[in-house]
Amino acid sequence: IVIQWWNYRGHKELALQNAIKHHYPVICSSNYYTYLNFPVTPWRGYTNTRTFDLKDIYQNNPSDKAINQKDPLILGMTCALWTDDGVTERMIDRRLFPRILALAEQMWYQGERLDFTRFHQNILQRKEWFEQMGFEFGPALKSEVKKGYQWD
């Protein structure tokens, strides 16, 4: 049995703690900062409580905090991008990039983490490459979203 811990919004770390207490391996999928269909700023039915930016992920992701416990029962982390709420293929890149890069950093990098300012600068330096490759790079931070920006 492997437990997928995902309902952070409803029960915080309860499922994670119970799984570890009973010696079950866990995959962290907290529904805060890992659902990439959530936009950076409010849009359609996504209120401010269901938005997040690169900084939120990098500094506040409950799944990342769990992985950093270095408990051998914590197997890793997942993220999701649900398209059942009107998110079309055309909209996907702006939700994935650059936020997926923070999640990849948390999932795979084992060295000392950069502070957020330096990480953000590294992301901005790579933006042009992503755009040249045909990816639509969305705003990284809420403060970068220009008035009138459309998520669709």
Where are these regions (language model features)?
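Substrate-binding groove of N-acetylhexosamine-processing glycoside hydrolases
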Residues: 1-152
